[in-house]
Every structure is written in C-alpha cells, then in structure tokens.
Design a protein with these regions (language model features):
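Conserved alpha/beta cores of soluble small-molecule-handling proteins
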Residues: 1-165
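Single conserved hydrophobic/aromatic residue that forms the stacking wall/gate
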Residues: 163, 167-173
C-alpha cells in the first residue's frame, strides 16, 4: 500500500463496521479536530499476531478515561476489531492504528461530554520504519520544546494532545 493515506484500497473498521478505506471520514466540526480529544495506539503485527495487543487495547481505554471520555467498546471488542481489520486487508505483517475520538455532536465547548465517542482501526503494510538506519544507527533530534508539567495534562495517556509539543519543533524549525 502506498500513496496518500486517504486514498487507498482496503477496509477500515469504524464504529462496529468494516467500511471502504476511502469512506472513513469525519466531519470538520468533530470535537477532536478542535480540542485534540483523541487517543491512539500504534502497533505492529507479525505473522498475523499483533504484538502485545491486549496491553495496547487496555492502555487505549485507560488513556481515554484520563482525557475524560469513555470508549464504548471493551478490550475484547477492540481486539476483535483489530483482527477483523487485519483479515479484511489480508495482512499478516502490518501496522495497526486504533484511534478513539470525541466526535461532532450537540456541543462544541471544550468538554462536550454529550458528543459521541468513536473508534476506528486501520491496518496497512508498513515496512521498517527506520529503513537502512536500523543497521547503521539513526540520527536523533531533541525537541527544543519542553513537555508540559505532569500536573497540567494526563502525561500517562497516549493522547494526541500530548504529541504536538514533540512534533512542533519539526514544524516550526
């Protein structure tokens, strides 16, 4: 699979159903788009088995609770969704991305607790992330941005809102 991530063949598991990859869309007024109310897991599958999958599913649920939303699926249901997506895309060795987010609803305030919570799982073939550097060694950068104080955000959560400070150095230069 190559090309733009929004224009691929395959299936994505979204809110209980396998849908066409290109149909996996969310509205521009989705709460997560404005307030980063989303959590995710990035996992690898080898020979059809997702590495430490249950632990990742447990952390996904825990991360969501830390940022004040509850994913409407159990660990077992998330596990089934991940493996359904792998099989639907006929993948054995793959990257598995589970993402949950507060969606568009009646509210657009910071909390928006009444808005629905969504879950999607995408799987795709993704080779060695580090390419040749895996054997040669990788160049590392240290962001000039300091992570927020642990009292300002739930730093244990694998939440989108906590990743931007690390990436901002790349964006800003």
């Amino acid at each position: 699979m190559s090309g733009s991530y929004d224009d691929r063949d395959g299936k994505i598991w979204m809110n209980g159903k396998l849908i066409e990859w290109r149909d996996a869309n969310v509205h521009i007024l989705t709460h997560a788009m404005h307030y980063a109310s989303s959590v995710f897991e990035g996992e690898r599958a080898y020979n059809g088995k997702i590495f430490k999958s249950v632990l990742h599913s447990q952390r996904l649920l825990k991360s969501a609770k830390m940022v004040d939303f509850e994913i409407p699926y159990s660990v077992d249901e998330i596990e089934k969704a991940k493996y359904d997506a792998l099989r639907a895309n006929k993948l054995e060795d793959a990257y598995v991305r589970a993402v949950a987010w507060r969606g568009a609803g009646e509210d657009m305030g910071v909390a928006s607790l009444r808005n629905p919570v969504n879950l999607a799982v995408a799987t795709w073939s993704w080779g060695n992330y580090y390419g040749d550097a895996k054997m040669k060694g990788a160049k590392l950068d240290v962001a000039k941005w300091q992570r927020p104080d642990p009292k300002t955000a739930p730093f244990e959560a694998k939440a989108c809102l906590l990743y931007t400070s690390d990436a901002a150095d790349e964006w800003i230069g």
